[in-house]
Amino acid sequence: MDDSTITYAGPAAKAPSDRVTETYEVPVVMPGMWDCHGHFLGVTRLDLAEVMRTPIAVSAARIVGDAYAALMAGFTSIREPGGLGVYLARVINEGLAVGPHVYGAGAILSQTAGHADIHEYPLKWIHDLAEQEGFIHVCDGIDGCLVATRTQLRLGAAFIKVCASGGVLSQLDDPIHQQFRDDELEAIVGEAERFDRVVAAHCHGKPGIIAALNAGCRTIEHGTYLDEEAADAMIAKNAVLVPTRYIVDRLVGFGRERGVPDYAMRKIEAMADQHKAALQIAIEKGVTIALGTDIATSGEDTVAPWGTHGSELRHLVDAGLEPLAAIQTATANGPLSLGRQAPQAGRLAEGFVADVIAVAEDPVGNIDVLAEPKNVTHVWKSGMLYKQPA
């Protein structure tokens, strides 16, 4: 590694000896991992209304710790589809906080009465939140969608996030229903493309998946009701699935006891088996997959705590991926989710970003080793060592 770039990767015996200044003996070395769906919200309970109730200064303080936890778990890059990530990235890049590379989308774009419209609050409050550059932006009509998209670009968004279907944590909508009209989705994608940004589409229902693909969205987040026809459409469009099986499992297992609203629990419990079946279809059909968790809460004793990202790999293997292919979703496939904003990263190869981790055991033989941050013994981000044994 030379500064932030890998200058050689291969057998140690063939390494250019005049360039070696330090050596480390580790069992396994691999690229730093990507979580392509995590929200820096700074809340301790997975409830959209909780974000409204939490002072922004408290949220901001919490996510600094969340970023550190992600890096210590071996995740050197986070793609954040809605939250405070655009601001956190600035602080990390200034060297004032320790964390991964953060590629934020700014606010989530939602139609009125959509997934990211917090239905239990007055609509004026939701619009006020957008005006204060909060984590959601409700917009309607082509003009409104253009303004919302440009607002995120003004904040420095690396991509755009849109809700193309209903969701779980939103109180009154149906996850199966399409959200935004086709022309609204096309306007958002077209405006993002003018700025070399891709669009990530939150989609549970098939109508939203197909509409998002037809509009040109690069990634489908969740894909709960994906079937063979939708999988074929994803392949034809060269789109990427970010399945987030982790959050489904965590909500079903721990949601009620960790304060997730009853309406959300009813939705996720009804969808859980379908979500796994959709992931299996995607794997069988050969859809490109990038790892994402939908991690969003601060603190270890919460429903989806930062630092537990590696658990998603077990879910991918259980759904049918070979361990090496699962690892690829967290490494080489991660940058695919950012289009032309992606760095040359995710591989141990000359010229790639020097994001590297060492692991106590070969994850190809035991994928669960990556679920425990303690098994990640070393972390280099852009060539700088951030973690090593004491």
Predicted regions and their residues:
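Histidine-rich, glycine-flanked metal-binding segment
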Residues: 1-30, 49
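Metal-associated gating/positioning segment near the N- to mid-region
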Residues: 27-94, 112-119, 183, 215
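Histidine/acidic-residue-rich catalytic or RNA/ligand-binding cores of hydrolases
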Residues: 44-48, 116, 170-171, 209-215, ...
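Active-site mouth loops of central-metabolism enzymes
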Residues: 48-61, 126-147, 198-200
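Divalent metal-dependent hydrolysis catalytic cores, especially in the metallo-beta-lactamase
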Residues: 62-88, 99-108, 157-171, 198, ...
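Histidine/acidic residue-rich metal-binding segments in metalloenzymes
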Residues: 144-241, 250, 255-260, 269-289
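His/Asp/Glu-enriched, well-ordered alpha-helical/loop segment
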Residues: 194, 263, 273-362
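C-terminal cap of metal-dependent C-N hydrolases
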Residues: 330, 348-390
